[in-house]
Amino acid sequence: MMNTKKLIKMFRKWQQRAALHRKRISFQRPSTRSTTVEKGCFVVYTADNTRFAFPISYLSNSVFQEILEISEEEFGLPTGGPITLPFDSVFLEYLIKLIKRRMDGDTEKALLMSISSARCSLQKQEQSTQQLLVF
């Protein structure tokens, strides 16, 4: 039989070796997407799970502020998760092109009105489907 002190010593030795091996194990990420963002940028996801990184300067754009407010109303504030926009990637790419072109005030107002009217029509559709489900 082995001495208790010897068993404890052997156990601690194996624990140390196991700890060393645990530190060396690195798992490969299954996706090739980068989870890091450049300094001065933030990330949003679209409804179809496409990832977009924007410079923080976009936050001063009124159109971008409006779509973030829509996202907040739709999904709530993210708690530990990414910001998700209720639009698909095609619409967001179109929006980026308009912002990069520095659209004039009339175009910006028209875009804001179309976004807000689409939001209102979506809310009406949701209310009507909720009423249908009740009856």
From Swiss-Prot:
Report if keyword Ribosomal protein is assigned.
no
Give any single GO term for biological process: auxin-activated signaling pathway
Where it sits in the cell: the answer is:
Cell membrane
One GO CC term on file? nucleus
Membrane-topology descriptor: Peripheral membrane protein
* InterPro entries, per the entry: SAUR_fam
User: Which keywords does this Swiss-Prot/TrEMBL entry list?
Assistant: Auxin signaling pathway, Cell membrane, Developmental protein, Growth regulation, Membrane
Q: Which Pfam families match?
A: Auxin_inducible
Protein family (similarity comment): Belongs to the ARG7 family.
Summarize the protein's role: May promote auxin-stimulated organ elongation, such as hypocotyls, stamen filaments and petals.
Protein's UniProt name = Auxin-responsive protein SAUR66
Gene (UniProt) = SAUR66
